Amino acid sequence: MPSDFISLLSADLDLESPKSLYSRESVYDLLPKELQLPPPRETSVASMSQTSGGEAGSPPPAVVAADASSAPSSSSMGGACSSFTTSSSPTIYSTSVTDSKAMQVESCSSAVGVSNRGVSEKQLTGNTVQQHPSTPKRHTVLYISPPPEDLLDNSRMSCQDEGCGLESEQSCSMWMEDSPSNFSNMSTSSYNDNTEVPRKSRKRNPKQRPGVKRRDCEESNMDIFDADSAKAPHYVLSQLTTDNKGNSKAGNGTLDSQKGTGVKKSPMLCGQYPVKSEGKELKIVVQPETQHRARYLTEGSRGSVKDRTQQGFPTVKLEGHNEPVVLQVFVGNDSGRVKPHGFYQACRVTGRNTTPCKEVDIEGTTVIEVGLDPSNNMTLAVDCVGILKLRNADVEARIGIAGSKKKSTRARLVFRVNITRKDGSTLTLQTPSSPILCTQPAGVPEILKKSLHSCSVKGEEEVFLIGKNFLKGTKVIFQENVSDENSWKSEAEIDMELFHQNHLIVKVPPYHDQHITLPVSVGIYVVTNAGRSHDVQPFTYTPDPAAGALNVNVKKEISSPARPCSFEEAMKAMKTTGCNVDKVTILPNALITPLISSSMIKTEDVTPMEVTSEKRSSPIFQTTKSIGSTQQTLETISNIAGGAPFSSPSSSSHLTPESENQQQLQPKAYNPETLTTIQTQDISQPGTFPAVSAASQLPSSDALLQQATQFQTREAQSRDTIQSDTVVNLSQLTEASQQQQSPLQEQAQTLQQQIPSNIFPSPSSVSQLQSTIQQLQAGSFTGSAAGGRSGSVDLVQQVLEAQQQLSSVLFSTPDGNENVQEQLNADIFQVSQIQNSVSPGMFSSAESAVHTRPDNLLPGRADSVHQQTENTLSNQQQQQQQQQQVMESSAAMVMEMQQSICQAAAQIQSELFPSAASASGSLQQSPVYQQPSHMMSALPTNEDMQMQCELFSSPPAASGNETSTTTTPQVATPGSTMFQTPSSGDGEETGAQAKQIQNSVFQTMVQMQRSGDSQPQVNLFSSTKNIMSVQNNGTQQQGNSLFQQGSEMMSLQSGNFLQQSSHSQAQLFHPQNPIADAQNLSQETQGSIFHSPNPIVHSQTSTASSEQLQPSMFHSQNTIAVLQGSSVPQDQQSPNIFLSQSSINNLQTNTVAQEEQISFFAAQNSISPLQSTSNTEQQAAFQQQPPISHIQTPILSQEQAQPSQQGLFQPQVALGSLPPNPMPQNQQGPIFQTQRPIVGMQSNSPSQEQQQQQQQQQQQQQQQQQQQQSILFSNQNAMATMASQKQPPPNMMFSPNQNPMASQEQQNQSIFHQQSNMAPMNQEQQPMQFQNQPTVSSLQNPGPTQSESPQTSLFHSSPQIQLVQGSPSSQDQQVTLFLSPASMSALQTSINQPDMQQSPLYSPQNNIPGIQGSTSSPQPQATLFHNTTGGTINQIQNSPGSSQQTSGMFLFGIQNNCSQLLTSGPATLPDQLMAINQQGQPQNEGQSSVTTLLSQQMPETSPLASSVNSSQNMEKIDLLVSLQSQGNNLTGSF
């Protein structure tokens, strides 16, 4: 009895809570004071009488006797006690009505009962009797005494009477808290039993009342209830009454019988039983699922509880017993002692194939009984048990509010078997499952839209966020670099009054640096208990206008624009000043500021949008008023001009970028006033103007579409024009944003005026070209503004002529041009570095313009870009300060660059604009402008990204831009894609996803760049492509053909632009490629991406569409040489190839696909096919770039990556795998990884960003090299030759499967190098493939012969890059890439030889012929690594992985060899790699190694360029050094 009493007491422990809950605190007093039993007696009598229908008076004693006899614990309590207990507990469980009423009524009686039990059996008996009398009073619900469940508990039975009584009270409360299950049991029984609660009618009161449950609970009933429903002293009463009732009901028989059999059974629900006993064990073989939505009684069935795979069901096995037994299943509490759950019941699920079972009610708890049969090995999959949720109101009615306080939403399935021993006794085994969450999990929060995209650094503005699943406890976080936990983040203040699940209002927190000079992009995400939002929304902090003179400047600027009220006047002014750089700068600033304001106004006026150029300008001028608001203008500028990316990413990063991209592209074609001015300064126009125009265009997509349509025609013209004039236009566009940033504008104007004046005046041809371009642009822009397409056609012709002149300059001085370009590249590197320093500002505004154009353009343009980039002077000042600090040397170099650029300005500008600038620079720059904004938004998000962007953007404009964005935006498009991608990628940028996208985009970009600078070449297709065409065949002619072909290609790729421009780019791309649609992922984004030349990038991002698009782009690139002749067919082919490239996915799937790829390659038999295939692969890689995140991570584990790469890279890898060596397959897979991994590795190494940055640097360098090379090649017309030459090797490569690698590398590298490098890239890739594929050796030989100079450059830039890229994830595989260039033949000859040959390969990268000859792999490799851009990047990329890996990668393409190579790798290389790897280390170390690497790479670049003079190489090295010093930023970001 003491034990019973104790159990009752433990149930009573809740008595404390019942105390407060129950009207009678005296009950508690009564428990200890047995004397107080009489008052409870009445209560208990009432409860005994139990309305539930228990025969309180007589049945209880009988029950008591039965119970006492049946239940040892109850017997210990005393016969009466046991009966009381038993009855009460069953009552509690079985009759929740009784329980609640009885409990309430019984609160006294049960308390009495408890005390009685505590006192003695006699007292209990008396109590029972008393309770019977009290039954009449039973209606006194108030007297619910604490549930004696615990009293019933066996564990409590040993308590002393009074002490137990007290304990029981405490234990009750304890139990209730301890196990919701007891409480729930109570609640369940009360729920079922609760006749009191009218609602309960729906519950099966009779069922639950059956004594079965009561008997179970006899002793443990109270326990059961006490835990979850422990608080119901009424339980005790109700249990008592219920028992009587239940016993009287047949429950008695059941109870007795079950008590007999099941005293164990009755304790079953509340009692604690072992899992293993007497050699018998009840095991849960398969645990149930962790979350199962319970159903309400009024709902339909939600099915049975499944296992965690959702394919099966929880499975139970009984070991050590071979006779049929009954398995009982009920729902218990989620933790602690096993008790029935108060709020959840088991319910039977019937179905065609479910196990037959029966539903039994024990103590108010539903128990499912299923047979365990030896025929099934005593194993049973329980597929017939669901979970039923009881209504809280029913539970409360049953057990009282106190008992139902604890609402646990977790439950366990409890499995129990009763095994009858030979002596007739019963052995009970019980095992609970793991907890199951019975509610719907909270949804992950999402942000769908926000009202504000940018804000000053002061913050405090309100942002409305519309989204999903904003639950209580939501936090809105602003974080600078979402991927870096240590970056600045701040929690925004939420207006809780207007808090809602789907919307909330927050105040923007102030930015930590109140003195930024350039817009900074951060990410916004929401965190709730369910996790954080996956998509990170971009948000831009703009410099405080009050802090700087921006307002004054802006006002001044605005005032000047205010004077020209009409667009015509402005145009006239622009025209008059068009030739004058200074005037042009000023006018564009004035015009641009209005443009920006007009963009702001455009929101008001949709018509201006229609006539993008004219209306824009006129609205701009007309909207001098708008401009009048300096801050608005500045903000608009920062959003539009300074950060076209801002406006696109900030305002509507997804939609805006597309329109912006289109707008940007379109503005190029058609901003009459701005273009005139801008085209005078080519640089500004593509990026800035598009930004400005984008800003103005953003408001009306129709106008944008129209503009885009116009732009399609104009795009060819304007792009040609832009190619030659891009620098000036960009500068002016930059100035336009600068005007918006008045201080920056002034500085930019002065700088641009000075620089452009130096640049343009110094080269007479350039000045002539510029003047012609200005005239053409002025006329054509005016015409385009007024006449739209006809004007654009004229403009195209004019542009073509101007580009021809430029190209003539370029081609006339191939060596000089190359030198100039090398210098420009070096200068660009410096400028880029400077811009890198400025890159934050550049990122914020037309950073890419600075990066891209400045690379190609003069430092002055970089300055103007910086100014433009910085929406405010403060931004540029900061940039300048950064430049000065980080790049005083760079500044000096920039000055030198400016001088050298001025000297070589004519050549360089002509070269840069038409070829280098146009090809890599102008395309890249306009993308850069577009990108920069995004970069601004994205980079601010990731300072590392910024650093990377700076570094990368500085070396190659496109690469830099891509790098600066580092995010998909960068990759997606040098400029416009950046915008669009940034818009789409902004969020991505902001988030880890963004990083992956960035990685993938960047990879795509890198690959794009590598595959003929596909991004730039997308622009190249429009502008760079034309440039490349110019390089290959007369910039203008080829540009036209490219535009025509490229138009088609652009229709596939650049055509995207046309279509995109006519429609939103997404639309363009949708039409552009079914694949684009197939790439649903980034169709819109792709639209944006494609909208700019970056469609390819996006295509890369999305496999199907980007594959097709990329092929065309690649074709255009590849066909830049080849494609010129057959660009459309190749484009078509490349789409086919790309469709085949879907086959490439098959190729990715493996060799068959590889063969297909090869056949594709063979079918195309041109590098462009190769590139397209490779690009498609790359695209696939990029498309699978998210996979590349796989690959990236897999790249870390390349074999893993290889499967994914096989998906991604295997097209290429398959090509690689086609090679005889299986390891080469892996390596080639890695090579492909490296190629994509260049991207992939960038993204995939521990420091994927660093790798990407490194890769980007490499790519940028390569791009520069490519530009140089392309200039060289274009000057030499080697591109065409190369293309033709390359085509055969690609064919060879394709046929041998080597081409996949070669094509990939070519595509990656040649994209990087543009087409001139494409052949070398192919060859390089072929050599890399040669490792795997002996056939490559033949290709390799042609590759070296054809592209020894190109290949050298290619190799320096691209193969190493690929290897390097590979290195982060898997150096060995990446090694394959490196091997391919130089050691391909050697590798073909013997894999072991390649070790030494590899060093030659790498050294050939420095000097492909000579180094190839040299076999000391470690040293050459070290030098190669140091010297080759790829080497540097390799080191950098390897840095993520390991210097050994780097050496290994360099050392060998073959994995086995890789280990050897790794071991043999020169210490220098590892050291430098280590330094680069430790880019996290002091930037100085990374810098030094990077500097050495970059400088060495620059010389390599010159070998790569082969036309580049060593002096130029030295300049490049210096630039690289300065870049590396600036690159410290990159290094830091790495």
Swiss-Prot record:
Database matches in SUPFAM superfamilies: E set domains (SSF81296), p53-like transcription factors (SSF49417)
Tissue expression profile of the protein: Detected in white and brown adipose tissue, muscle, heart, liver and kidney. Expressed in lymphocytes (at protein level).
Region annotation Disordered: where it falls in the sequence: 34-89, 175-220, 241-265, 607-666, 845-885, 953-993, 1241-1369, 1478-1510
Ranges for domain RHD: 264-443
Modification Phosphothreonine, positions: T135
Biased composition (Polar residues): 241-260, 619-639, 654-666, 865-875, 1270-1286, 1294-1319, 1335-1369
Cross-link (Glycyl lysine isopeptide (Lys-Gly) (interchain with G-Cter in SUMO2)): K555, K602
Consequence of gene loss (knockout): Embryonic and perinatal lethality with incomplete penetrance. At 17.5 dpc, 50% of the expected Mendelian rate with only 3.4% of the expected number living past 21 days after birth. The few survivors to adulthood fail to thrive and their weight is half compared to the wild-type. At 3 weeks old, kidney hypoplasia and an altered medullary morphology are observed with an increased apoptosis in the kidney inner medulla. Under osmotic stress, the transcriptional regulation of osmoprotective genes is altered in the kidney medulla.
Cross-linked residues, Glycyl lysine isopeptide (Lys-Gly) (interchain with G-Cter in SUMO1): K555
Biased composition (Low complexity): 63-89, 179-192, 876-885, 963-977, 1250-1269, 1320-1334
N6-acetyllysine modified-residue sites: K122
Compartment(s): Nucleus; Cytoplasm; Chromosome
Modification Phosphoserine, positions: S120, S134, S155, S560
Keywords: Acetylation, Activator, ADP-ribosylation, Chromosome, Cytoplasm, DNA damage, DNA-binding, Isopeptide bond, Nucleus, Phosphoprotein, Transcription, Transcription regulation, Ubl conjugation
One GO CC term, this protein: nucleoplasm
CDD domains named in the record: IPT_NFAT, RHD-n_TonEBP
Bias-annotated ranges (Basic residues): 200-212
GO MF, any single term: DNA-binding transcription activator activity, RNA polymerase II-specific
GO biological process terms held by the UniProt record: cellular response to cytokine stimulus; DNA damage response; DNA-templated transcription; negative regulation of urine volume; positive regulation of canonical NF-kappaB signal transduction; positive regulation of gene expression; positive regulation of leukocyte adhesion to vascular endothelial cell; positive regulation of transcription by RNA polymerase II
Quaternary structure note: Homodimer when bound to DNA, completely encircles its DNA target. Interacts with CIDEC; this interaction is direct and retains NFAT5 in the cytoplasm. Does not bind with Fos and Jun transcription factors. Interacts with DDX5 and DDX17; this interaction leads to DDX5/DDX17 recruitment to LNC2 and S100A4 promoters and NFAT5-mediated DDX5/DDX17-enhanced transactivation.
Protein name per Swiss-Prot or TrEMBL: Nuclear factor of activated T-cells 5
Source organism per UniProt: Mus musculus (Mouse)
Lineage: Eukaryota, Metazoa, Chordata, Craniata, Vertebrata
